[in-house]
C-alpha cells in the first residue's frame, strides 16, 4: 500500500473519533465538561484503532459505560473517552455448561432479558442496576450476597498499549468486593462469558417476576436518575476497628447526622431516600456535588473520627480532592 492509500485508510479507520464532545449528557449525574476526543467503537478493529490513536497522541483514556458511577470534572476530560458499542450476545453449550458471551458495551438489563429469553437463570438478581457488561465486570457487580464473579467464566480483553487481544480465565480478573484486575487499566474488556442455569418455562416466568420485583424494590429505596448511586464506599472492617466503630455502612453515620434530604450545595442535595446518594435537582455542576460531598466527608470525620472516601470514579481531576 502506498503512503497516500495508507493515510486514507487510517483516516477512514479513525473517522468515528469525534472532537470536543460534551459528557454531561452521557452520565447519570448529568454534569461535567467536554472530552477532548470521544468515540463509540462498534467492532474490535475500531476498538484497536481507538487505542492506537490514544497511544500515538499520548492521550489518557477514559472507558465509559452507562456513566452511573462517575463524577466528571467541569473542565471535562483531556484525553480520549471510549464508550464501547460491542452489544452482541451469544448462547452456547460447552461441556454441559450453558454459557452466554456478551460484548462489553451491552446494557446489563438487556443481557438479563437475553438470558431469560433463552430460559437461563442467575443474572436476574442484578436487575435494575445501571451498568454495561464492561462496567459490571470492572467492579464485580454485586447486589446483597450475589456477586457477578459467581457466574463469570472467562473474558476477552484488549491491551491498552499494544491492542493485543486474548482470552483469559476468571482467575486472571482476581475478583473481590468492588474489585477486579481491570481497575489497573492496562487491559480493557471486549466480552465476557457467564455460566448460567437452564430453567423451565414456568421457572422463567417466575424469574421474570423476580426481576420486576427487584427493580420495584430498588426504585422504592433509591433515586433512579441524576445520581451515581452510593457516592462513598463503605468502610473496610479494618477501618471500622481502628476507629473503634462497629458499622461499616457510611449511610449509617450520615443518617445519624440528620443529613438525608436536608444538606445541599447549589442544586446538589443528599437524597431523601438514601443518605449516601447525591441527586442533581436539575442544574447542579460537578463543583456543587464536590462541595457537598466534601462537606459530608468533613462532618462524618468530625463527628465519628472516620473518613469516608468516594466509591465513584473521579474523571478529569488533576488531583483527588478527597485525599488532601
Language-model-detected regions and their locations in the chain:
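Short amphipathic alpha-helices in soluble, non-transmembrane regions
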Residues: 10-13, 50-54, 207-211, 292-296
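Short polybasic amphipathic segments
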Residues: 89-92, 153-157
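Short loop/turn motifs at secondary-structure junctions and domain boundaries
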Residues: 147-149
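Phosphate/pyrophosphate- and phosphate-bearing ligand-binding catalytic cores of soluble enzymes
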Residues: 18-19, 25, 70, 158-160, ...
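A common structural junction motif
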Residues: 56-60, 216-219, 297-304
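Anion-binding (especially nucleotide phosphate/pyrophosphate-binding) glycine-rich loop
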Residues: 2-136, 141-143
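Generic beta-strand structural signal
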Residues: 78-80, 98-100, 121-125, 135, ...
Amino acid at each position: 500500500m502506498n503512503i497516500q492509500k495508507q493515510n486514507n485508510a487510517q483516516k477512514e479507520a479513525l473517522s468515528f473519533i469525534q472532537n470536543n464532545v460534551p459528557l454531561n449528557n452521557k452520565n447519570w449525574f448529568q454534569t461535567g465538561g467536554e472530552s477532548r476526543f470521544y468515540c463509540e467503537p462498534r467492532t474490535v478493529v475500531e476498538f484497536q484503532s481507538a487505542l492506537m490513536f490514544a497511544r500515538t497522541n499520548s492521550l489518557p483514556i477514559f472507558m465509559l459505560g452507562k456513566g452511573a458511577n462517575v463524577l466528571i470534572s467541569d473542565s471535562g476530560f483531556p484525553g480520549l473517552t471510549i464508550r464501547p458499542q460491542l452489544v452482541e450476545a451469544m448462547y452456547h453449550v460447552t461441556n454441559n455448561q450453558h454459557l452466554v458471551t456478551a460484548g462489553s458495551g451491552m446494557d446489563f438489563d438487556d443481557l438479563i432479558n437475553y438470558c431469560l429469553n433463552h430460559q437461563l437463570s442467575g443474572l436476574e438478581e442484578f436487575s435494575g442496576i445501571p451498568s454495561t457488561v464492561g462496567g459490571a465486570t470492572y467492579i464485580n457487580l454485586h447486589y446483597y450476597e450475589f456477586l457477578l464473579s459467581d457466574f463469570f467464566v472467562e473474558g476477552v480483553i484488549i491491551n491498552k498499549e499494544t491492542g493485543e487481544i486474548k482470552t483469559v480465565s476468571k482467575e486472571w480478573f482476581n475478583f473481590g468486593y468492588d474489585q477486579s484486575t481491570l481497575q489497573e487499566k492496562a487491559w480493557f474488556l471486549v466480552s465476557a462469558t457467564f455460566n448460567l442455569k437452564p430453567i423451565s418455562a414456568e421457572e422463567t416466568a417466575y424469574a421474570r417476576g423476580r426481576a420486576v420485583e427487584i427493580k420495584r424494590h430498588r426504585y422504592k429505596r433509591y433515586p433512579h436518575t441524576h445520581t451515581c448511586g452510593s457516592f462513598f464506599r463503605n468502610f473496610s472492617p479494618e477501618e471500622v476497628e481502628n476507629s473503634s466503630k462497629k458499622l461499616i455502612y457510611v449511610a449509617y453515620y450520615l443518617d445519624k447526622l440528620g443529613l438525608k434530604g436536608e444538606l445541599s450545595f447549589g442544586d446538589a442535595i443528599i437524597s431523601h431516600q438514601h443518605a449516601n446518594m447525591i441527586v442533581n435537582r436539575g442544574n447542579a455542576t460537578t463543583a456543587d456535588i464536590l462541595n457537598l460531598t466534601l462537606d459530608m466527608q468533613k462532618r462524618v470525620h468530625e463527628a465519628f473520627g472516620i473518613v469516608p472516601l468516594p466509591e465513584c470514579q473521579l474523571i478529569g481531576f488533576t488531583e483527588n480532592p478527597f485525599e488532601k
